[in-house]
């Protein structure tokens, strides 16, 4: 993997980006100052942010995929999605409150998450491997919050920023894989009682489990894998919708109940 940043630059950028998250202030995208940065550099920064959180006592409780729409990938000129990690304090209970004072410019996406019962190891991981390894699925709403000004960034910058990860809400009911067709699963997103987005699971790479296979293969590039018992958000079924203090959101999942939260 081609890298252009030295260790000191990685450490400084990881601290800079994480401070923006923890202090809820926006920053210029990092490629403004480091235009030669590569994806390998960006993931090295992301893993350093992860290490900083673990050193501080936070637990890493899951993984997430981003850029999981074929159209969006074509628009960005890339061939694979991106991934990030989920820290323990990102979790919000169903019906709970999201404190916007700790965020910059939050948006929500409807997603399907899975929990694995067996490890998944790339390269060469495919959807059949994922089907055999998934324990159950659960409806999830992701709150994304880019640390970059005006939510404007390039792909390398967003990878370094942990794929804009900040909060997630799980709810509805868990289901076994054989009891639900994730490809045709319908989703309705409501904000303040009005429908704002509609979608189906096929929006995620044709099938949400394809996203999990890609995650295993991306992790393999760093010598990592997906352990058994991993919570994975597979990617946005709907477009991202901006939220602000005073907003109430509910996302309804066909046959799986709903997930809701209040923003203050």
Curated annotation (Swiss-Prot):
Gene3D superfamilies associated with the record: Fumarylacetoacetase-like, C-terminal domain
InterPro entries, per the entry: 4-oxalocrotonate_decarboxylase, Fumarylacetoacetase-like_C, Fumarylacetoacetase_C_sf, Hydratase-Decarb/MhpD_sf
Keywords, alphabetical: Aromatic hydrocarbons catabolism, Lyase, Plasmid
Gene Ontology cellular-component annotations: cytoplasm
Signal peptide start-end: none
The protein's Enzyme Commission number: 4.1.1.77
Native source species: Pseudomonas putida (Arthrobacter siderocapsulatus)
Stated name of the protein: 4-oxalocrotonate decarboxylase
Metabolic or biological pathway, per its Swiss-Prot or TrEMBL entry: Xenobiotic degradation; toluene degradation
UniProt keyword Signal present: no
Listed Pfam families: FAA_hydrolase
Entry's family note: Belongs to the hydratase/decarboxylase family.
Superkingdom of origin organism: Bacteria
Transmembrane segments: none
Listed GO biological process terms: toluene catabolic process
Keyword Lyase (UniProt): yes
Record field: catalytic activity: (3E)-2-oxohex-3-enedioate + H(+) = 2-oxopent-4-enoate + CO2
GO MF annotation, one: 4-oxalocrotonate decarboxylase activity
